[in-house]
Amino acid sequence: MRILHTSDWHLGQNFYSKSREAEHQAFLDWLLETAQTHQVDAIIVAGDVFDTGSPPSYARTLYNRFVVNLQQTGCHLVVLAGNHDSVATLNESRDIMAFLNTTVVASAGHAPQILPRRDGTPGAVLCPIPFLRPRDIITSQAGLNGIEKQQHLLAAITDYYQQHYADACKLRGDQPLPIIATGHLTTVGASKSDAVRDIYIGTLDAFPAQNFPPADYIALGHIHRAQIIGGMEHVRYCGSPIPLSFDECGKSKYVHLVTFSNGKLESVENLNVPVTQPMAVLKGDLASITAQLEQWRDVSQEPPVWLDIEITTDEYLHDIQRKIQALTESLPVEVLLVRRSREQRERVLASQQRETLSELSVEEVFNRRLALEELDESQQQRLQHLFTTTLHTLAGEHEA
């Protein structure tokens, strides 16, 4: 029995006003080819198929077309909802998908099922667990403090997994089949990136890996970096197939090829997802940024490299956007973001905390607040204009 474990596609993501359609199409084409090459029996998508609850039409088209094309290979597809997915959006095509060898699990309450091989024989027992919304698994209780709410939710998630595993064992019976569980949540020790949202805000930071049942493989989603959890080879995040934030660029992206033999986990192989949209982060003062940009001088690059430029100088130059534009206009790059480095923002905030409002003019307060936002030059100019107009209006009313 062979499966491909993938997650966090985020179809339809708007990345600083840029579409990811071409990248996602290339990934899905590669995934289809990979499933055929390795004669995979099933593909498990562990949540966040879409980036929003109301994905754009092209994202739905990518999803639907992939399901149709995969059906021709005999490979079964299991799609589980993540915290970004809308239950209603996934469920609207669930019955049609069932005729296309695809199981859609959008919410809690789905019992374990037999996952077939390509030839139709039983291959594994699947505990199809999507993102568990608190309202689906716990009853609200009045009077609980924060710690009690956290313990209540932790116990509910643990019980849900343990009950599903017990039901899976009954379904398996005496058959030599592995048990595969899924999940879409943060586990203790997982390394997150900037694009990952907290999903149990104020109640549960992370789920302890030791609370998972002893399934043969646990296919997790929500964290965008591939990683093994708690030193347990069978508990894994595969990560997203493309970088979803600039702090993910430069790191390999994977799909896990998981092989079972005689009802047990045999191997997990990381398959590198090809990069189709280059991205880079440049960090330093203006002179350093200028030097780093030279690596693309006289280079033919298609598509252009998407850049995040982090300025580390003490003085965040007012016309930095214009200077960066002049430096890059003849290079095969596209600057999507210009900002202070995180360390610089923290230093600026720390120094400003020693000042009082009485020491600053209204304009200084506004300019410092504006500098903390990641806005392009046109947006900054518009806000500056609106602010200046407002000041003049207020001054006129005061004089009147």
UniProtKB/Swiss-Prot annotation:
Keywords from the named record: DNA recombination, DNA replication, Endonuclease, Exonuclease, Hydrolase, Nuclease
Molecular-function GO term, any one: single-stranded DNA endodeoxyribonuclease activity
BP GO terms, sorted: DNA recombination; DNA repair; DNA replication; DNA replication termination
Pfam families listed in its UniProt record: Metallophos (PF00149), SbcD_C (PF12320)
GO CC terms, sorted: DNA repair complex
SUPFAM superfamilies from the UniProt entry: Metallo-dependent phosphatases
Assembly and binders: Heterodimer of SbcC and SbcD.
Role this protein plays: SbcCD cleaves DNA hairpin structures. These structures can inhibit DNA replication and are intermediates in certain DNA recombination reactions. The complex acts as a 3'->5' double strand exonuclease that can open hairpins. It also has a 5' single-strand endonuclease activity.
Protein family membership: Belongs to the SbcD family.
Name of the protein this chain belongs to: Nuclease SbcCD subunit D
Source species of the chain: Escherichia coli (strain K12)
